[in-house]
């Protein structure tokens, strides 16, 4: 996977001028004052007319007191282009004063030239600022802002970009200017800064400052600014994409996007790069190593359980439903694992089997083939959340939480992993998700060496390298090493991934197909059915469709097909029939069912026998109960087959995307 390199080239004359301007001004200022002070002291010290503090009016002092502050005052006057000297017979000039006057003149020329050039530059840009519209505003020039800038440059839209950055020392400001973007130095939470960026006339705003609180303040200020616009002043709502760094906060905030502001003239979408990176890995990079036979089981090892590790665990549990049709195994390790695992289990109590008995045991004590089966229902859960029903699926996966040794090359830890990997049908995959790129790289390399010594040289190791494209490119070139980078901004924070995500498009198609089936069923009964629009569906159900869309990519890989963005208008995809062999169709339906079960469990849903009336079923849904959270054979499988039957049909309707035969077809 080639990485994108940014070449930051500044013209030599500009580089020298900008770096030396401050030095020149400082040097001339010092020279003016020092030589001027010395010259005036020399001038008055060499004459009999030394300034004094003797009183006026004829009062006589035997010995007048010499006032040496006068030379200081005269030296300061040089900065105002006032020579301050009395060049006559009584006060002869000297070479020190000549140097000081020359330095003062040069200082005036340098400073005034810089000011005039800045004013001329502002005047030059003023017509463009006053007429700018339908442009893109990027608040924050960090990793995400840079990626957006690069993507817009590739689309030929970079001159329609305005960067708002509050740090004048940001090393990428010159890069942005060289690309042709407009750069504003200012606080994006302030109304005057947003006014200068003309956000009221913009097409899109990306709020990527790197601080969740600041980003929300920007959204609120945008709402205030657009609230009182007349309909004639804006034809379409301003599209605002706000990055929320905290994955859990982003999930909680997403349903409230419509109430983050009071303006009908803007729409807000929340995105999270960590979630994007984890989903990208599971749906695009994991398939070659995934379990594909029913005799196989995935054993995922997550090293580092911070924000990225937790996002990875959630995505693997939600959409890691493969053709093996088994629960996934997890070994999750970090320093002081209880500190991060306990809040995670509190948020996702049905992620795995566990007990809150103060024993210190988190997750499962061991792995067994019986517990890999979805019908296994004997592992414990806290009594308060356990469902007392033999048909219920209680939790999504089997996970153990262990301490990560301080030493990265701990042989005992590698030996323990190797022992777990050597069982029949085990498909181990390691994810290194620490907080620092360099530490992740070192841990991945050292663990690879340790596992090789334990006879597990073929274990793939995915390493999170979001900030070091050079390291990621190095690993990409060494594909035989089975150390694979992920999480780079050119995929997780790409412009199209944020503004037009595939999961949103497929999710809408899934919902439309569902509404079509419901309308047909109602018509057969002689009833009317009011179809719901995508925007009117509760966010929880919209997100469920999005997760189903994520998994659609894995189902397509199961039948040897992949969906990709169309890069040119002439690019053609294959045409695929919607008919599957019955055994393939059943496998895909089972994959969808257990994917749906895991997603529902993580969202807090529980099993309950089917309601006997519409009112009871509606009440169960409100309380997050569902009778289908059970094994495939005991569920209403029609819903799963319905979704499978529209895979090709719906995916081939997507504008801007094509289906094609995957390179690793079965």
Q: Over which residues does each language-model region extend?
A:
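Surface-exposed intrinsically disordered loops and tails
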Residues: 375-383, 608-634
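Cytosolic regulatory regions of ion transport systems
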Residues: 1-32, 36-73, 77, 81-590, ...
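Short, charge- and proline-biased low-complexity linear segments
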Residues: 537, 548-557, 611-619, 646-650
């Amino acid at each position: 996977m080639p990485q994108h390199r940014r070449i930051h080239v500044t013209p030599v004359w500009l580089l020298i001028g900008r770096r030396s301007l401050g030095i020149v001004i400082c040097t001339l200022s010092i020279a003016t004052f020092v030589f001027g002070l010395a010259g005036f002291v020399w001038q008055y010290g060499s004459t009999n007319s030394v300034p004094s503090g003797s009183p006026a009016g004829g009062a006589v002092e035997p010995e007048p007191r010499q006032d040496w502050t006068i030379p200081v005052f005269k030296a300061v006057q040089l900065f105002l282009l006032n020579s301050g000297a009395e060049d006559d017979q009584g006060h002869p000039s000297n070479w020190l004063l000549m140097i000081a006057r020359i330095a003062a003149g040069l200082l005036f020329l340098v400073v005034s030239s810089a000011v005039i050039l800045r004013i001329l530059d502002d005047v030059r840009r003023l017509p463009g600022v006053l007429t700018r519209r339908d442009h893109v505003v990027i608040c924050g020039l960090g990793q995400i802002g840079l990626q957006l800038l690069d993507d817009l440059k590739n689309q030929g839209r970079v001159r329609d970009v305005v960067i708002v950055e509050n740090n004048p020392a940001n090393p990428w400001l010159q890069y942005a200017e060289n690309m042709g973007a407009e750069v504003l130095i200012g606080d994006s939470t302030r109304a005057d800064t947003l006014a200068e960026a003309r956000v009221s006339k913009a097409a899109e705003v990306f709020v990527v400052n790197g601080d969740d609180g600041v980003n929300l303040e920007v959204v609120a200020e945008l709402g205030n600014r657009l609230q009182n616009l007349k309909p004639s002043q804006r034809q379409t709502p301003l599209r605002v994409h706000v990055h929320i760094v905290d994955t859990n906060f982003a999930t909680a905030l997403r349903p409230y996007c419509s109430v983050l502001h009071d303006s009908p003239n803007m729409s807000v979408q929340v995105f999270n790069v960590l979630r994007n990176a984890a989903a990208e890995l599971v749906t695009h990079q994991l398939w070659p190593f995934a379990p594909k036979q029913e005799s196989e089981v995935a054993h995922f090892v997550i090293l580092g359980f911070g924000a990225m590790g937790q996002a990875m665990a959630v995505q693997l549990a939600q959409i890691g439903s493969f053709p093996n049709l088994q629960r996934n195994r997890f070994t999750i390790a970090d320093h002081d694992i209880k500190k991060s695992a306990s809040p995670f289990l509190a948020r996702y109590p049905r992620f795995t089997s566990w007990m809150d008995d103060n024993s210190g045991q988190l997750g499962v004590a061991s792995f067994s083939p019986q517990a890999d089966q979805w019908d296994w229902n004997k592992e414990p859960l806290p009594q308060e959340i356990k469902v007392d029903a033999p048909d219920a699926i209680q939790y999504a996966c089997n996970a153990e939480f262990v301490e990560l040794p301080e030493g990265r090359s701990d042989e005992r830890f590698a030996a323990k992993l190797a022992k777990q990997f050597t069982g029949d049908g085990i498909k181990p995959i390691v994810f290194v998700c620490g907080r620092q790129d360099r530490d992740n790289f070192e841990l991945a390399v050292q663990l690879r060496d340790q596992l090789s010594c334990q006879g597990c040289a073929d274990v793939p190791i995915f390493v999170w390298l979001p900030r070091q494209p050079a390291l990621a490119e190095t690993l990409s070139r060494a594909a035989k090493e089975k150390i694979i980078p992920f999480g780079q901004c050119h995929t997780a924070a790409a412009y199209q991934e944020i503004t037009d995500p595939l999961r949103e498009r497929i999710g809408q198609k899934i919902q439309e197909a569902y509404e079509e089936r419901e309308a047909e069923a109602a018509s057969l009964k002689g009833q009317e059915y009011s179809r719901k629009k995508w925007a009117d569906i509760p966010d929880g159900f919209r997100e469920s469709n999005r997760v189903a869309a994520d998994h659609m990519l894995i189902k397509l890989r199961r039948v040897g097909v992949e969906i990709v963005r169309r890069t040119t208008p002439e690019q053609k995809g294959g045409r695929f029939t919607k008919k599957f062999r019955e055994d393939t169709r059943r496998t895909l339906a089972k994959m969808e069912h257990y994917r749906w079960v895991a997603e529902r469990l993580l969202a807090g849903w529980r099993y309950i026998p089917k309601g006997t009336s519409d009112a009871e079923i509606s009440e169960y849904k409100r309380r997050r109960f569902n009778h289908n959270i059970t094994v495939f054979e005991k569920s209403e499988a029609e819903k799963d087959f319905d979704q499978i039957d529209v895979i090709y049909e719906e995916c081939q309707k997507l504008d801007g995307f094509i289906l094609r035969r995957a390179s690793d077809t079965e």
